[in-house]
C-alpha cells in the first residue's frame, strides 16, 4: 500500500473513532497496520456500554469504500449482538470480526498477540482501557463485581 494512502487511512480511522463518540478522544486509537490488514479494536465492556458501534462502522464504510481493495479491516471483540445486526454492513466493506472471549479454539487470539508482541492479553486490555477511555482498571473491576452481584441477587429474588 502506498505510504500516502497508509497515512490517509490512519487519519480516517482516527476521525472515525472521534466521530463515533466523545469518549474516544485519544488520536492514537488502537489502529495498527499488519500486512494487508487494519486492526481496529473495540474492547468488550466499552464496546457494549460506551461506543456507538454502528456509527463508527458506518463512518468507516463510507470513508473506506474507495480504498477497500488495499486492505481488510478486522474488528476484535465486537459484541455478538452488534455483529449479528451489522453483518451486511461489515461484509460490504470486507470488515472481518472476531470475539477474543469465544475464539481461543479457532486460533484468533494468537493473531492479536502477534500484533502486539510485547504484551499478553491482560496488559493489552489494561492499555486499551487506560489510554483510549481514561478509565482506571480498578473501577472496571468494581463495576464488574457489582454487575455480577446484581445479576445473582436478581436471580435469587426470582427463584
Curated annotation (Swiss-Prot):
It is found in: Membrane. It is a multi-pass membrane protein. The chain crosses the membrane at residues 38-58, 135-155. Its main location: membrane. GO terms for cellular component: membrane. Keywords: Membrane, Transmembrane, Transmembrane helix. It comes from the Eukaryota. Completely overlaps YRF1-1. Belongs to the UPF0479 family. This is Putative UPF0479 protein YDR545C-A. It comes from Saccharomyces cerevisiae (strain ATCC 204508 / S288c) (Baker's yeast).
Amino acid at each position: 500500500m502506498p505510504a500516502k494512502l497508509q497515512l490517509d487511512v490512519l487519519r480516517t480511522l482516527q476521525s472515525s473513532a472521534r466521530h463515533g463518540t466523545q469518549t474516544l478522544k485519544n488520536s492514537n486509537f488502537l489502529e495498527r497496520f499488519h500486512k494487508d490488514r487494519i486492526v481496529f479494536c473495540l474492547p468488550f465492556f466499552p464496546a457494549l456500554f460506551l461506543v456507538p458501534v454502528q456509527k463508527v462502522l458506518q463512518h468507516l464504510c463510507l470513508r473506506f469504500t474507495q480504498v477497500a481493495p488495499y486492505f481488510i479491516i478486522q474488528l476484535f471483540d465486537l459484541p455478538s449482538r452488534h455483529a449479528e445486526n451489522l453483518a451486511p454492513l461489515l461484509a460490504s466493506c470486507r470488515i472481518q470480526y472476531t470475539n477474543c472471549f469465544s475464539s481461543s479454539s479457532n486460533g484468533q487470539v494468537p493473531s492479536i498477540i502477534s500484533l502486539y508482541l510485547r504484551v499478553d492479553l491482560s496488559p493489552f486490555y489494561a492499555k486499551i482501557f487506560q489510554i483510549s477511555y481514561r478509565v482506571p482498571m480498578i473501577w472496571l473491576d468494581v463495576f464488574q463485581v457489582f454487575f455480577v452481584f446484581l445479576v445473582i441477587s436478581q436471580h435469587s429474588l426470582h427463584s
